Amino acid sequence: MVSKKSNDQSVEYASKSLRVSINSYISFLNDPSLKNATEMAIASNLAGMAINISKTTAPHAVSYPFTSLFNVSHGHAVGLFFEKFFSFNYKNKDKSEPSFDLKKRFDLIFNLFDVQGINDFTSKISLIKKQAKLEDNLQTLNINIKQSSDDIIKGINLLRPVSYTH
C-alpha cells in the first residue's frame, strides 16, 4: 500500500485482503476451520493481486537470507523487521516523492488496523506476531547479525522488485 508502484487498484485489493485477514488470521492459526481457511485463502489471493501490481517491498527482499541461512520460514522472515521498516518509512514520509498522498495511505492502514498512529500500529503488529507465536528475538532464533552480516547482505535478493517509499 505504500510501495511507490502501488495504485488505486492495488490499494483496493490490499485493503480488502487486510479487512479479511485481520479478522481471520489468529483464529485460523488457533482453530482452523473451513470458514477461516477460506477467508485466509481469499485474503492471500487479494494480497497476491495487490503485490502483482505494486511489487514487493524491502521486508520481502531482506527476508531471503533469513530463510536460506537460518531456516526461518519465508513469511516469518518477511515479518522479522516489518515494524522497523514500516516505522522508518512513516517517519521519513516527507522525504519520499510517490505519485500519491503517502500520508493518506498510512492513515488508511491505521484505519484498517483500528489504531491511532504509528506507535499503535507497530504495537498491534507486534501483538499479532506474538499471538501467532512468531519469534522476533534474533538471539532466540540463533541469528548472530554481527557474525553473519556479510552472508545476510549477500543473500538479500536485489532482483526481487523493491519499491518501498525509500
Question: Predicted regions: what is each one?
Answer:
Residues S17, A58, A77-F81:
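Catalytic-loop motifs flanking and including active-site residues across diverse enzymes
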Residues M1, S24, P65, K84-F85:
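Amphipathic alpha-helical segments in well-ordered regions
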Residues L18, M40-G48, F82-F85, I125, ...:
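Short alpha-helical scaffolding segments that buttress acidic/His motifs in well-ordered protein cores
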Residues M1-S54:
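Carboxylate- and glycine-rich phosphate/diphosphate-binding segment that chelates Mg2+/Mn2+
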Residues T165-H166:
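Conserved small/polar residues in nucleotide/adenosyl-binding loops
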Residues S21-I22, P59-S63, L102-D107, K129-E135, ...:
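Short acidic (Asp/Glu) and glycine-rich catalytic loops that position anionic groups and cofactors
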Residues S68-Q147:
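Gly/Pro-rich interdomain helix-loop hinge
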Residues M49-G75:
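Glycine-rich phosphate/pyrophosphate-binding beta-alpha loops
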